[in-house]
Swiss-Prot record:
Residues 1-20 form the signal peptide. Coiled coil: none annotated. Glycoprotein that probably modulates membrane fusion events during secondary envelopment of cytoplasmic capsids that bud into specific trans-Golgi network (TGN)-derived membranes. Interacts (via UL20 interaction region) with protein UL20 homolog (via N-terminus); this interaction probably plays a role in the coordinate transport of protein UL20 homolog and gK to the trans-Golgi network (TGN), and is required for the cell surface expression of gK. Glycans are attached at N58, N67. Its main location: host cell. Residues 21-91, 209-227, 302-312 are extracellular. This is Envelope glycoprotein K.
Length: 312
């Protein structure tokens, strides 16, 4: 059923899968000189109540636990750093980054499947989203088995699909004209639509949270190209999602304004073109604002992640 999804959604799913696969590959083969980072303070500053900060391994320093400082000789005390927390960054790649990328892929795959099912059987405000139910897998399988095994034509399933298409058209009309009454009469239907939207939102949030690898303490030991690839993949998915959200709206506006533009002359065409552009730009701005708010929320969480890791 996934193969019938919109091409942009399938492309997003492919990019997410490549992102998760590349993350797993890097976590397996990455050659990190020292994959552990430490939240440490120089000896003496810990007694003054200083706040520890994350740092990469320093071969000239001596890392000790807070309860081991008394055993140090005076010659080593200048090189001693008191460790309050540490993190294995290779394990971080597997336990946090890869899991988030895999969860994002699974949620988006579930969204694509749910949307595909709704395009066949469920309501849409835009009829252009409809897929013919005759392409349903069970309908095709029933007709093929009847023709090859039994040697006859089987049309009952096709009739049932046609009835579903009629029912879908009626529900879509109610969704456009009176969504509140539709929600009251068919709460399960609205719940399934909200579940579909929730799957997509959850996939986006999980994907954007993977940006934590560029700001987490482990970013100190990851090379620049690895952090750049994370941003490239996430921004590519964000751009494709923005494109998938705006292209249907552009097509609807273009289709609605095509006839007046041809019949009213140059002035009408200019007015329609201006209205079309303003509507499209407003939609793009709204989607971009939503994307910025989502990224901002994730980055705000990552800003406090260091303190949560050290003191929580």
């Amino acid at each position: 059923m996934l193969l019938g999804g919109r091409p942009l959604h399938l492309l997003v799913l492919g990019v997410m899968g490549a992102y998760a696969g590349l993350g797993a590959y890097y976590a397996t083969v990455a050659r990190l000189p020292h994959p552990v980072v430490y939240a440490a303070l120089p000896l003496g500053e810990d007694a003054a109540g200083g706040a520890p900060d994350w740092e990469a391994f320093n071969a000239t320093a001596i890392y000790v636990a807070p309860n081991e400082t008394d055993a140090l000789s005076p010659a080593l005390r200048d090189r001693a750093r008191v460790v309050y927390a540490r993190r294995d960054c290779r394990a971080y790649l597997w336990d946090v980054h890869f899991r988030l990328a895999a969860v994002a892929w699974l949620l988006y795959a579930a969204f694509v499947y749910a949307r595909q099912e709704r395009r066949m059987f469920g309501p849409f405000r835009d009829p252009a989203e409809f897929l013919t139910p005759e392409k349903y897998t069970l309908n095709y399988a029933a007709s093929v088995l009847a023709a090859t095994v039994i040697g006859c034509s089987y049309t009952k399933f096709a009739w049932y699909m046609a009835e579903l298409a009629t029912r879908r058209a009626a529900l879509s009309r109610d969704l456009r004209e009176d969504p509140i009454t539709l929600a009251h009469r068919h709460p399960t239907l609205i719940a399934l639509i909200l579940l579909e939207l929730g799957l997509r939102l959850g996939a986006r949030m999980a994907l954007f949270t993977t940006l934590g690898v560029t700001r987490a303490p482990c970013a100190l030991v990851f090379p620049l190209y690895a952090r750049a690839l994370v941003w490239i993949f996430v921004l590519a998915v964000g751009a494709l999602e923005l494109l998938a959200a705006t292209l249907p709206h552009i097509a609807r506006v273009s289709g609605a304004t095509a006839t007046p533009a041809r019949s009213d002359g140059g002035r009408a065409a200019l007015g329609v073109c201006g209205a079309c552009c303003s509507t499209v730009l407003a939609g793009i701005f709204a989607k971009a604002l939503y994307l910025c708010l989502l990224v901002g929320g994730v980055l705000l969480f990552l800003h406090y992640e260091r303190h949560i890791t050290i003191f929580g």
